[in-house]
A protein has these predicted regions:
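Positively charged n-region of N-terminal signal peptides that target proteins for export
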Residues: 1-4
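Bacterial signal peptide processing site
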Residues: 19-21
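Structural detector for short beta-strands of small beta-barrel domains
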Residues: 23-42, 113-132
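Short, basic/aromatic beta-hairpin or loop at an interaction surface
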Residues: 46-57, 136-148
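N-terminal post-signal-peptidase region of extra-cytosolic proteins
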Residues: 57-67, 149-158
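OB-fold/S1-family single-stranded nucleic acid-binding modules
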Residues: 90-108, 180-199
Length: 200
């Protein structure tokens, strides 16, 4: 009887120790060969796109995967650890992902939906706005209900702004590398919808 009680105690202790360390899960992910674009906390940002084995669509991972060196043009299969953070940083994910194993790396082009490369219509005011001594475009997005003019801090490829004219642009997005391992969102004019001289 005593031996049975001791065995029960040891088993309970072992299970308790396992539960105490059971603050993470192990998953297998497919990582797309291209980065997508998604809404971050303040603006659009490049994101990894991943699928679990039972997923049918890609989803965005904002914080990246610790220990994983992404190279565009390859589709990856990874085994990763997802750890729930007890006290996550403000404005950050409550889950931290880290690489356990690189299962495969295959050169290919993943089939990414166009929704991960958003296009939008932008209106540009005839006069720029000054902010800490620098001039910026003043823009708004009435098609999505953003009717107040706001400062625009990003370059728009293919747009030659001429002060004194108001513009309506169709703008597209893409991901470009700016340094080894670093990427940013590039904005480009898809179509000049309207250009009018400012009203007196």
């Amino acid at each position: 009887m005593r031996k049975y009680i001791i065995l029960l105690f040891i088993s309970a202790f072992a299970l308790g120790a396992c539960d105490k360390n059971d603050d993470y899960t192990v998953r297998e992910w497919t990582v797309a060969s291209q980065l997508g674009i998604s809404h971050g906390f303040h603006t659009l940002q490049p994101v990894l796109l991943v699928k679990a084995n039972d997923d049918t669509s890609w989803r965005a991972v904002y914080e990246g995967i610790e220990g994983f060196d992404y190279e565009p043009g390859y589709e990856y299969k990874l085994r990763i650890k997802a750890k729930q953070l007890a006290e996550p940083p403000q404005d950050a994910s409550s889950v931290r992902y880290s690489l356990l194993e690189l299962i495969s790396k295959i050169p290919t082009r993943s089939n990414i939906p166009d929704s991960y490369y958003p296009t939008f219509t932008m209106e540009v005011a005839p006069e720029p706005v000054s902010y800490y001594g620098e001039l910026y475009l003043s823009v708004r997005f009435p098609e999505v209900g953003l009717n107040d003019w706001q400062r625009w801090s990003f370059r728009i490829e293919g747009f030659d702004y001429e002060q004194g004219y108001s513009y309506k642009l169709k703008v597209g997005t893409s991901v470009v590398g700016v340094d080894e391992g670093y990427y940013t969102v590039q904005y480009s004019v898809l179509e000049m919808l309207d250009k009018q001289p400012a009203q007196e």
